[in-house]
């Protein structure tokens, strides 16, 4: 059965970008189904207005309760039972790869609410949203791009969505570390060579090299991640070798 993903959005055209690449192929293969609902379709105001001035004053406009509530209610009825509603907001919990793995493992329909303007009426969040997530400590013009990022990351974790079974498992953050470097043909270009170990065909040595590089890249670029990963004695040895090779104390 296809995983059903939905988006409440004022700009459904933006979400159409998900129909390309890996995510598009997953849709074509029937692994996932994506629908959009526009709150304007449930607006009783002139010109399908869905926003109004904030109580208490202040700049900008706020998305109104009524059309959002009606859109969410309709979407959830079409997505049937076992549907989780997610609001994408800078105020939400910052999503990590482990969070995405847990969400994907639940195989639960997901309805994303993409806000616009200054935000949405708080009563929607407090009474009709199950979880609030953020991509990070920055602000976007709307939640559509955040929803697409979330959807892309979820689809990558669906078995069969990628061309190779191990592709998702090698992604950065899947094991708490950054991914190892990747190379392709030619073996030499502009005086730059592919590491010899990758050309030798010794899979055990290649695996060891990739693990060392993964540990090393994490140490160089995201040392904070190493504090959260339980390293084996072999990992510690590989990391020590990497540090020595890169000018750190041996």
Curated annotation (Swiss-Prot):
Ranges in a coiled coil: none
SUPFAM superfamilies attached to this UniProt entry: alpha/beta knot
Q: Does the keyword Nucleotide-binding apply?
A: no
Q: Name one GO molecular function term.
A: tRNA (guanine(37)-N1)-methyltransferase activity
Gene3D superfamilies per record: 3.40.1280.10, tRNA(m1g37)methyltransferase, domain 2
Q: Which UniProt keywords apply?
A: Cytoplasm, Methyltransferase, S-adenosyl-L-methionine, Transferase, tRNA processing
Tell me if Ribosomal protein is a UniProt keyword of this record.
no
Pfam families hit by this protein = tRNA_m1G_MT (PF01746)
Gene Ontology BP terms: tRNA N1-guanine methylation
Identify the CDD domains for this entry. TrmD-like
Subunit text = Homodimer.
Similarity remark:
Belongs to the RNA methyltransferase TrmD family.
Protein role? Specifically methylates guanosine-37 in various tRNAs.
Q: What is this protein called?
A: tRNA (guanine-N(1)-)-methyltransferase
Biological source species: Legionella pneumophila subsp. pneumophila (strain Philadelphia 1 / ATCC 33152 / DSM 7513)
């Amino acid at each position: 059965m296809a995983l059903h993903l939905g988006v409440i959005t004022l700009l459904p055209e933006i979400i159409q970008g998900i129909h390309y690449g890996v995510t598009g192929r997953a849709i074509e293969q029937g692994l996932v189904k994506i629908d959009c609902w526009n709150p304007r379709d449930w607006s009783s105001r002139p010109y399908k207005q869905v926003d109004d001035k904030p109580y208490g004053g202040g700049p900008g406009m706020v998305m109104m309760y009524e059309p959002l509530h009606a859109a969410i209610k309709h979407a959830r009825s079409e997505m049937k039972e076992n549907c989780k509603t997610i609001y994408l907001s800078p105020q939400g919990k910052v999503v990590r790869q482990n969070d995405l793995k847990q969400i994907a493992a639940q195989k639960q329909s997901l309805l994303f609410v993409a806000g616009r303007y200054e935000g949405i009426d708080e009563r929607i969040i407090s009474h009709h949203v199950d979880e609030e997530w953020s991509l990070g400590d920055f602000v976007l013009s709307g939640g559509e791009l955040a929803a697409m990022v979330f959807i892309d990351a979820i689809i990558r974790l669906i078995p069969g969505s990628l061309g190779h079974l191990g592709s998702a498992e090698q992604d950065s953050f899947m094991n708490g570390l950054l991914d190892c470097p990747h190379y392709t043909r030619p073996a030499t270009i502009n005086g730059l060579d592919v590491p010899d170990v990758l050309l030798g065909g010794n899979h055990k040595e290649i695996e060891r090299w990739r693990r060392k590089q993964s540990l090393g890249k994490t140490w160089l670029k995201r040392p904070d991640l190493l504090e959260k990963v339980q390293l084996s004695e072999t990992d510690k040895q590989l990391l020590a070798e990497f540090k020595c090779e890169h000018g750190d104390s041996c």
